[in-house]
């Protein structure tokens, strides 16, 4: 986590210093192989508000930026084309596959919810109804393919009161690296800037990560569903069933009870679906102290900010910026077969 005290252009940190865990020769050989791993295409549709990223003609993921409560990635496809994430769930319909947001209060204004802006929609029966609070995609700054990688950069604005009150600006960067066999890696940096005045962050102590990922139920440790009117007195009933997924962190802990709110360099969520094991891992920034991770067996997980910026109000002064960098590894196999620990070592050594 980095705080930057300037409104000038923010540079993405790519060169890292953590020691590699792989043999030097193997690490050195990786970049050339990755550059030729797959052909990348970008397909942008402003009418639909989507930017599709394809590897060898197959969809890898889509950046959703149209009339949405907040821009997000969905779907995020596994190497064999299964949806690793889910866009909207019941319960927790505010979850958005892969998303980034938090509650914030611009000095002199009310608290705005950018964690769950869905609930601020003016007319909940009309999908095209505006949102009182919203993270809005402003424009793309970069869409390029170079040396076998894709680089995406977008300008966003966190807005309250139907767009009348700009709260913060955001610069979002995603570097896409194909790994072969349908696998790929996303190097993501999210930077928010208090461009319009002091902003007080008001995160919930428990229910937040930065960013969040919500796995599809077919990859979750537990499956939950709502049975309408099936509970006592005709109330809705939440049903939980054992799923196929497994959560594993860098320290060897397994599943939600052992990994939630525990410090780790990375957390992996994998499952065997239709006889094929695949998964998604979140990597923390190797240049920062390892964070605590929020994890849930029903499918949600992600890194948190440092303790002094978690679960308690803190102020981002006017002109200051706050950045979060993570890696997302989409892989075949489980945590071992997918070489998650080795891939993190590559990331830390600047080889991804």
Language model features: what each stretch is:
Residues 1-6:
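N-terminal secretory signal peptides that target proteins for export/translocation
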Residues 102-182:
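Extended, loop-rich substrate-binding clefts of extracytoplasmic carbohydrate-active enzymes
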Residues 8-21:
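Bacterial N-terminal signal peptides
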Residues 280-352:
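Beta-strand-rich recognition/accessory modules
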Residues 156-162, 174-178, 192-196, 215-219, ...:
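Beta-strand elements of well-folded, non-transmembrane domains
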Residues 27-99, 103, 198, 204, ...:
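Beta-strand-rich N-terminal accessory domains
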Residues 66-68, 72-78, 179-227:
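Acidic (Asp/Glu-rich), glycine- and aromatic
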Residues 203-288:
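Active-site/ligand-binding surface loops and adjacent short beta/alpha elements
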């Amino acid at each position: 986590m980095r705080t930057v005290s300037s409104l000038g252009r923010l540079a993405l940190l790519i060169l890292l210093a953590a020691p590699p865990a792989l043999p030097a020769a193997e690490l050195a050989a990786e970049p050339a192989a990755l550059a030729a791993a797959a052909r990348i295409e970008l397909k942008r549709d402003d009418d639909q508000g989507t930017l599709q990223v394809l590897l060898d003609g197959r969809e890898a993921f889509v950046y959703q930026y149209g009339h949405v409560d907040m821009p997000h990635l969905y779907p995020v496809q596994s190497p064999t084309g299964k949806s690793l994430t889910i866009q909207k769930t019941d319960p927790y319909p505010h979850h958005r596959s892969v998303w980034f947001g938090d509650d914030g209060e611009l000095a002199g204004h009310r608290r705005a919810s950018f964690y769950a802006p869905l609930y601020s929609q003016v007319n909940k029966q009309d999908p095209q109804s505006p949102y009182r609070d919203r993270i809005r995609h402003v424009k793309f700054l970069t869409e390029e393919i170079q040396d076998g990688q894709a680089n995406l950069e977008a300008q966003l604005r966190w807005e309250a009161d139907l767009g009348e009150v700009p709260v913060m600006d955001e610069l979002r960067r995603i570097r896409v690296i194909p790994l072969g066999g349908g696998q790929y890696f996303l190097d993501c940096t999210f930077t928010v800037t208090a461009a319009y005045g002091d902003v007080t962050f008001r995160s919930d102590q428990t229910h937040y990560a930065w960013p969040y990922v919500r796995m599809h139920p077919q990859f979750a440790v537990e499956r939950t569903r709502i049975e309408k009117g099936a509970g006592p007195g005709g109330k809705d009933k939440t049903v939980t069933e054992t799923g196929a997924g497994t959560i594993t962190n860098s320290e060897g802990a397994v599943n939600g009870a052992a990994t939630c709110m525990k410090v780790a360099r990375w957390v992996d969520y994998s499952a065997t679906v239709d006889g094929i094991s695949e998964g998604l891992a979140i990597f923390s920034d190797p240049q920062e102290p390892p964070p605590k991770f929020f994890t849930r067996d029903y499918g949600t997980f992600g890194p948190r900010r440092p303790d002094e910026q978690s679960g308690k109000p803190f102020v981002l002064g006017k002109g200051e910026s706050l950045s979060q960098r993570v890696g997302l590894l989409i892989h075949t196999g489980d945590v071992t077969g997918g070489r998650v620990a080795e891939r993190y070592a590559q990331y830390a050594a600047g080889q991804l």
